């Protein structure tokens, strides 16, 4: 982890994630699955800080967000039990990781150690290290240097920050449906942050996890039980380019087998129940079009800068009054230089007929960088100004079978200019909820000024606008409260000439 930071606010990562009931419950289970997949990779790579952040995010999602969904009460009991058991494993691992994370931070920045302020803040239960300044580190728990404080993320747009008004984790346990009212000593014992914050003296765990990087391997993801079906019809898979980032073999999340943890786990298990969700707004699910396609000509391993647009760069905006709650940029995303041309060849027939074509982008995570290693062409229905996948479950099954992260979508504008329509931003909203790094690529072959664009919704501005919009079809959107744009051109995306990708045609 050769990185730097100005402020580490790990506790902020556990801030409550609000529920959008237009999005199906199974989608939230997939978000949980993706968080655990990232945690597995960070664990295998011995990246304890990002691992800690991912586990905190999962605990918040499992304790608060998922049980608050309006469909949770009627969901399968097996899914609830699976979630509860994974949560127990995660909470146990978090307790063990606290001293390891503190030690790692001290090792990385020994000269800055006197400047840390490692303590639990009584007002909000957060834990912060202040003013440890080093340049240009993009991490979930490391704020960008020299950025003004940023707005709070309305959803999952930032890895290091969720909602401002988050109660302490102890308070979250009190809100759960528990079998008994634990005393303060018990609450302190089971707090994720612990009675003494990260500086508390727990014995660090010993991991036997090994990591290898073969050139080409398929491995199964952590999957919610109800989504374990395989694809019935075999998709056509072709090789799209040359080199591929090696995929790590990762071990699943490990629950402690030590006897000292047995009583802790049993007591914590008795406290956890998901039967008291908070009241939520009963909005109907709004079905927006599924993932679409794009083109690009960029130099080797340089940021994929699109031609000038009025939107500023695709960065998470930072303007929070509280310095400890700054948000961070997404991780780097690498795209094969030839991928957009490959997609346009696949879309050629539709483009000639003035019909849009869409594709889904998926890939892998290695050394804190995402790589798009698969271009999935789903069964779809198209018009001159829209494109919608017709079998979303088939797409999910392909991603799960190959342990791929959902990294966005690509689609054509056969005769229109290069921009994100109102339908496009609604489509991309679900991708960016799933993963902040997800991008929307628009291919506009008839646009002489820019024939492609790589976009993300702004956070929190654009994400909040779309989250609060219940309209369908083409319509106007109001500007975000901060006066900024709804979406931006991305600048953390790199075109990689050595990256290999597969084309998976499901049509």
From Swiss-Prot:
Q: How is the cofactor bound?
A: Binds 2 Zn(2+) ions per subunit.
EC no.?
3.4.19.-
Q: Which UniProt keywords apply?
A: Cytoplasm, Hydrolase, Membrane, Metal-binding, Metalloprotease, Protease, Ubl conjugation pathway, Zinc
Cite the PROSITE patterns for this sequence.
MPN
Cofactor(s) recorded for this entry are: Zn(2+)
Q: Which Pfam families match?
A: JAB, USP8_dimer
Q: Where is this site: Indirect zinc-binding?
A: 356
Ranges for the MPN domain? 333-463
Annotated Zn(2+) 1 binding sites: 411, 413, 424
- Location of the protein in the cell: Membrane; Cytoplasm
Q: Name the InterPro entries on file.
A: JAMM/MPN+_dom, MPN, STAMBP/STALP-like_MPN, USP8_dimer
Question: Could you state one GO cellular component term attached to this entry?
Answer: membrane
Q: Please name the GO terms of the biological process aspect recorded for this protein, alphabetically.
A: protein K48-linked deubiquitination; protein K63-linked deubiquitination; proteolysis
Which principal EC class is assigned to this enzyme?
hydrolase
GO MF terms, alphabetically ordered: K63-linked deubiquitinase activity; metal ion binding; metal-dependent deubiquitinase activity
Find motif (JAMM motif) and give its ranges. 411-424
Q: How does it sit in the membrane?
A: Peripheral membrane protein
Superkingdom of origin: Eukaryota
Question: Binding positions for Zn(2+) 2?
Answer: 426, 469, 475, 477
Question: Main role?
Answer: Zinc metalloprotease that cleaves 'Lys-48'- and 'Lys-63'-linked polyubiquitin chains.
Q: What is known of its domains?
A: The JAMM motif is essential for the protease activity.
Q: Which PANTHER family match?
A: AMSH-LIKE PROTEASE, AMSH-LIKE UBIQUITIN THIOESTERASE 1
Q: Which family does it belong to?
A: Belongs to the peptidase M67C family.
Protein name, UniProt field: AMSH-like ubiquitin thioesterase 1
Q: Which organism is it from?
A: Arabidopsis thaliana (Mouse-ear cress)
Upper taxonomic lineage: Eukaryota, Viridiplantae, Streptophyta, Embryophyta, Tracheophyta
Whichever gene encodes this chain, its name is AMSH1
């Amino acid at each position: 982890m050769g990185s730097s930071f100005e402020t580490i606010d790990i506790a902020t990562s556990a801030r409550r994630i609000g529920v959008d009931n237009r999005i199906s419950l199974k989608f939230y289970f997939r978000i949980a699955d993706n968080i655990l997949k990232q945690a597995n990779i960070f664990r295998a790579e011995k990246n304890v800080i990002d691992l800690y952040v991912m586990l905190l995010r999962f605990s918040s999602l499992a304790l608060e967000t998922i049980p608050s969904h309006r469909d949770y009460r009627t969901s399968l009991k097996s899914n609830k039990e699976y979630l509860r058991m994974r949560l127990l494993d995660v909470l146990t691992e978090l307790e063990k990781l606290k001293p390891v994370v503190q030690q790692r931070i001290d090792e990385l920045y020994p000269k800055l150690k006197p400047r840390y302020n490692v303590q639990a803040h009584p007002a909000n239960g957060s834990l912060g290290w202040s003013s440890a300044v080093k340049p240009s580190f993009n991490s979930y728990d490391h704020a960008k240097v020299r950025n003004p404080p940023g707005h709070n993320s309305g959803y999952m747009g930032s890895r290091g920050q969720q909602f401002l008004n988050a109660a302490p984790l102890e308070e979250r346990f009190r809100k759960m449906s528990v079998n008994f009212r634990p005393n303060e000593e018990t609450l302190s014992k089971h707090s994720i942050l612990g009675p003494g914050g990260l500086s508390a003296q727990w014995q660090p765990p010993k991991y036997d996890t090994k990591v290898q990087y073969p050139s080409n391997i398929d491995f199964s993801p952590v999957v919610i039980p109800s989504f374990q079906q395989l694809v019935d019809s075999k998709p056509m898979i072709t090789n799209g380019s040359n080199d591929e980032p090696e995929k790590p073999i990762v071990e699943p999340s490990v629950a402690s087998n030590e006897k000292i943890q047995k009583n802790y786990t049993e007591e914590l298990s008795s406290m956890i129940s998901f039967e008291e969700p908070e009241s939520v707004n009963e909005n109907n699910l709004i079905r927006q079009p599924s993932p679409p396609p794009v083109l690009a000509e960029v130099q080797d391993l340089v940021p994929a800068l699109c031609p000038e647009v009025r939107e500023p760069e695709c960065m998470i905006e930072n303007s929070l009054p509280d310095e400890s709650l700054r948000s961070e940029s997404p991780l780097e995303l690498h795209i094969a230089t030839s991928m957009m041309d490959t997609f346009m060849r696949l879309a050629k027939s539709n483009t000639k007929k003035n019909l849009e074509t869409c594709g889904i982008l998926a890939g892998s995570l290695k050394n804190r960088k995402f790589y798009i290693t698969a271009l999935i062409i789903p069964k779809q229905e198209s018009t001159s100004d829209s494109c919608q996948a017709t079998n979303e479950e088939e797409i999910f099954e392909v991603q799960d079978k190959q342990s791929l992260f959902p990294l966005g979508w690509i689609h054509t504008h056969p005769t229109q200019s290069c921009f994100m329509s109102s339908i496009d931003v609604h489509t991309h909203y679900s991708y960016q909820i799933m993963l902040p790094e997800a991008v929307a690529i628009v291919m506009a072959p008839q646009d002489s000024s820019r024939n492609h664009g790589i976009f993300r919704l702004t956070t929190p501005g654009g994400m909040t606008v779309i989250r609060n919009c219940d309209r369908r079809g083409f319509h106007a959107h109001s500007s975000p409260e901060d006066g900024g744009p709804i979406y931006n051109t991305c600048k953390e995306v790199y075109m990689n000439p050595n990256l290999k990708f597969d084309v998976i045609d499901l049509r």
